[in-house]
């Protein structure tokens, strides 16, 4: 009888813990952030009842990276700030809590990496913002490929092909899209939303169907962090601007022409970034 009582108490305790954990999960989800209001303003919220100061920083403010706005603490322990109405666009932001910067919004599942910084993001819908969002249009494909360079190393690239490429036989122009300092072959796809933008522009007839090649221009590493034998190295602003990537470029173009149905002429190639 004693064993049965102990077992019943144990089961009851487990049930309480599971129920409590479930309640805590739902309580966290009660914090809505970011909330896009009808007038285009955005309300940010962060549950941090023990914090002394919380600010929000992002590219919706004029001086990106340095400008921040103080958030107000509510009695519930939630900190809150509402912006002015924002133009239609994609915006990145993060919180600063008691001096700890680069805190992603735990209520926002949408996160991108810019070099070594993780940032939350949101999209204000409208003429410009809609290009960043996936729409009900024909979608292209993105492949990650490895190409052998003159130095014997294989380097990783991301390549976008437009809708219909796999089923067709036609040849396409090529855009070589270069990332900025500290970036890699994933930068334009994640932070830049390249695939969504291309799908939408092509669907509207504003862009010719094309192949887009996104190279990894960091000569010290062969891929974005975590995608090669080099392991989970921490991304950083590389100072290895020795000009060797420029020497690799003809090899990259040749590899793309050999492996994809391209219009292999200079007038059908473009480079940007």
Question: What are the roles of these predicted feature ranges?
Answer:
Residues 4-9:
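Sec-dependent signal peptide recognition
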Residues 11-20:
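Hydrophobic h-region of N-terminal signal peptides that target proteins for export
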Residues 22-47, 123-136:
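Non-catalytic, glycine-rich low-complexity segments
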Residues 35, 43-88, 98-124:
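Aromatic-rich carbohydrate-binding modules that target alpha-glucans
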Residues 87-156, 162:
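Non-catalytic accessory segments flanking enzyme active sites
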Residues 157-161, 169-182:
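Short beta-strand element of the alpha/beta-hydrolase
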